Amino acid sequence: MKAINIALDGPAAAGKSTIAKRVASELSMIYVDTGAMYRALTYKYLKLNKTEDFAKLVDQTTLDLTYKADKGQCVILDNEDVTDFLRNNDVTQHVSYVASKEPVRSFAVKKQKELAAEKGIVMDGRDIGTVVLPDADLKVYMIASVEERAERRYKDNQLRGIESNFEDLKRDIEARDQYDMNREISPLRKADDAVTLDTTGKSIEEVTDEILAMVSQIK
């Protein structure tokens, strides 16, 4: 098969990262977790006491993705591995706000385009098919019900030892959907040439197989 790029977009907790990792593994491609980039910048934003000088924040930031056999993708922020700090509730609650800022978006998108230049990339996010990889060979827009997404987030939090309330998670996801879809810069939307894939009630294996079937149709 020729070298291709695959873009997976969709709202929070639609299963993008989990599926992207699986697809990349099955196809011996490289998975790029763009959300982790925004989470890393949000982590720094919080460490800087919620600075509003986002241009200065990114100007004074180095951000790299590395791969370790025991951990998979690791995020190196200012020469520190911050991977284990990026899924806490504080980062999750602020990441949409930070990611909506133009200096942050420009900084991350530039990095993402550089990573995808050689092809062989599976990338997931909110604006991959529309902004980062508009020429991706396959674009999939993943959706799922709010209830299912809240359940996934609840289970993920349990595995990480993070206490959470199911109803609060539902409200947070609904609020984030509205914020992501209505933000001025790179709003969440389906690319015109993307395939919609509803993952509600489907297993990881089922969704992975559906995407692999799409890949097999690429000429």
Curated annotation (Swiss-Prot):
Q: What class of enzyme is it?
A: transferase
Record's subcellular location? Cytoplasm
Q: Major place of localization? A: cytoplasm
EC nos: 2.7.4.25
Annotated ATP binding lies at 10-18
Q: Which InterPro entries match?
A: Cytidylate_kin (IPR003136), Cytidylate_kinase_dom (IPR011994), P-loop_NTPase (IPR027417)
GO cellular component terms, A-Z? cytosol
Q: Which GO terms describe its biological process?
A: nucleobase-containing small molecule interconversion; pyrimidine nucleotide metabolic process
Name any one GO molecular function.
dCMP kinase activity
* Assigned keywords, A-Z: ATP-binding, Cytoplasm, Kinase, Nucleotide-binding, Transferase
What reaction does this enzyme carry out catalytically? CMP + ATP = CDP + ADP; dCMP + ATP = dCDP + ADP
Homology family: Belongs to the cytidylate kinase family. Type 1 subfamily.
Q: What HAMAP family does the record tag this protein with?
A: Cytidyl_kinase_type1
The name this protein goes by in its record: Cytidylate kinase
